[in-house]
Design a protein with these regions (language model features):
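An aromatic- and histidine-rich active-site surface loop
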Residues: 29-31, 92-107
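Short amphipathic alpha-helix
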Residues: 2-13
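A donor-sugar binding/catalytic signature common to diverse glycosyltransferases
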Residues: 91-96, 113-114, 248-291
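A nucleotide-sugar donor-handling region in carbohydrate enzymes
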Residues: 122-198, 224-226
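Donor-nucleotide binding loops and adjacent catalytic segments primarily
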Residues: 9-10, 176-255
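Active-site proximal beta-strand in glycosyltransferases
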Residues: 105-122
Length: 306
């Protein structure tokens, strides 16, 4: 999500003079401030909705369902608080935060959703109560129906496109600006991405001691979630190079000859645009990453390894 937010904000600042941008988020707010400094404003507030993962990176369905019920109980206060702070915004753009469109309705503001999936679609795949009317799904649908426009990215599920066919416009991939890099031909560069959800953390930790024996390959590995023992092994190795921070990991993609990562939308986008060969890992019980892989397979640009 941060990749799209950065690109969108850069475009707004570049093309619209005298525009004041304020971002409402929590976990990734420091990444945005690292990029934009004081060019925009920041409001640190959790948007209530996210997936909950187990230690192995797979989705915890029980806790994720509890999260949705917490969203249902908390969204009214969130909207009231935001109405008090932002009584007259000119435009609300959301990367699929459903209650943002209720805020737009309350403040009589135009709204745009930009994403490749919606939380009502995700909820139906993972948590829907099939035995009775589902209040959470009803409220999610109601929130999204209030959005004025949907900008639909590639790889979006057909159900979402059909559901919002009167409001949507298809757009291309949204990616970061990458610096031009000069690559050495002496060794192959392999980027191993431990993404924000830490899906591959366990796998990478087990693999690191053996990478030093593959001497014709330089490995670039994210280090944020690793202990000092692992970090020391990285420091001592002559062919393993630590990359600290999600932003720097993504900006290492142009340098890579090969990428190993979770099948997340942003990583797929960047490897496709930059034409980088990759191995993508699915997440257990995650309909989003599973769907991404299904779409790539449908386009006949990947093979499946079981």
């Amino acid at each position: 999500h941060t990749v799209r937010q950065r690109s969108l904000i850069k475009s707004i600042l570049k093309n619209i003079k005298y525009c004041e941008v304020e971002v409402i988020t929590s976990k990734k707010i420091l990444l945005l401030k690292e990029t934009f400094k004081n060019k925009i404003k920041y409001h640190h507030k959790h948007n209530l909705i996210e997936t909950i993962k187990k230690k192995d990176g797979s989705i915890d369905k029980i806790k994720t369902k509890k999260m949705f019920h917490h969203w249902l109980k908390s969204k009214k206060k969130w909207i009231i608080d935001m109405c008090k702070k932002y009584p007259n915004p000119d435009l609300i753009i959301s990367d699929s935060v459903p209650q943002a469109f209720e805020l737009a309705k309350k403040t009589n503001t135009k709204s745009i959703n930009i994403s490749h999936f919606t939380w009502n679609w995700f909820y139906k795949k993972h948590c829907k109560n099939t035995k009775s009317k589902d209040k959470v799904l009803y409220e999610l649908d109601k929130s999204y129906n209030l959005a004025d426009n949907f900008l639909i990215l590639p790889l979006t599920p057909a159900e979402i496109i059909k559901k919002y066919k009167k409001k949507h416009k298809k757009i291309n991939f949204v990616i970061s600006d990458f610096d031009k890099v000069k690559k050495t031909k002496k060794k192959i560069n392999c980027l191993i991405m431990d993404n924000g959800t830490k899906t591959l953390s366990v796998f990478i930790k087990k693999t690191i001691p053996y990478l030093k024996y593959i001497k014709n390959v330089n490995f670039f590995v994210g280090i944020k979630s690793y202990n000092q023992k692992i970090k020391k092994k990285l420091i001592k190795s002559k062919n393993i190079f630590p990359v600290n921070g999600l932003k720097k990991i993504h900006h290492t993609i142009p340098l890579a000859d090969f990428v190993i990562a979770r099948a997340g939308f942003n990583t797929i986008t960047e490897t496709l645009i930059l034409k980088k060969p990759a191995i993508f890992f699915n997440e257990v019980d995650n309909e989003e990453t599973s769907f991404n892989i299904k779409m790539l397979r449908k386009l006949k640009i990947i093979s499946i390894i079981n």
